[in-house]
């Protein structure tokens, strides 16, 4: 685990171009900025090529979209591939809504992601494995989560992050589990979206997308855990504020002190 990538990120200040969920766009922008990256957001297809050109990494969030936005997502994804920019996809609720799965499947036929990050229900859906998802939440299902993540990675030929109490990161063969975290991530709408964009930021500072993905997950989970451990009586509202503070101030040494992964 190359936690020194966090220092590289803060030194290089990579631009991350986001097609964002309007519900969480401010959380994503603030989270990236606090960590040390530079977020840009746009929904104008005419500038997609130039925006991708400026970016070190691209993150496409499927949380809230219209037909026009689907075309924008497609254009940006194709531009990212054409310009060889690392591309992260967050397939929100594809496990709960069939239309969303159809849209995501169509998009993934038109461009290739380097990393896909989702919960168990979303990753299972993309792997065509049965799972009972609940809206944007993972829901409940019976299955080997590592096998599900590996199946998705092998099917789509990319790194997959299956987020949950334990984050599973795999390229289809190698597997890393991040054991850090806090249940407060589940009550902070936008924490998953924030992580997806942070993954893109780490991908911008190393060509090794598997290393970038696992490091991003560990950094984010460990920082969230430290907030709960160091802030008295933190709740859903105050957690959001303290998380941003911690994204800005937490050092590599502090993360190493609590890091738990296998």
Curated annotation (Swiss-Prot):
It catalyses: 5-(2-hydroxyethyl)-4-methylthiazole + ATP = 4-methyl-5-(2-phosphooxyethyl)-thiazole + ADP + H(+). Its EC number is 2.7.1.50. Pathway: Cofactor biosynthesis; thiamine diphosphate biosynthesis; 4-methyl-5-(2-phosphoethyl)-thiazole from 5-(2-hydroxyethyl)-4-methylthiazole: step 1/1. Its cofactor is Mg(2+). The keyword Glycosyltransferase does not apply. GO terms for molecular function: ATP binding; hydroxyethylthiazole kinase activity; magnesium ion binding. Pfam families: HK (PF02110). The keyword S-adenosyl-L-methionine does not apply. Substrate binds at residues 41, 190. Coiled coil: none annotated. ATP binds at residues 117, 163. Keywords: ATP-binding, Kinase, Magnesium, Metal-binding, Nucleotide-binding, Thiamine biosynthesis, Transferase. It comes from the Bacteria. GO terms for biological process: thiamine biosynthetic process; thiamine diphosphate biosynthetic process. Catalyzes the phosphorylation of the hydroxyl group of 4-methyl-5-beta-hydroxyethylthiazole (THZ). Belongs to the Thz kinase family. NCBIfam families: PRK09355.1. This is Hydroxyethylthiazole kinase.
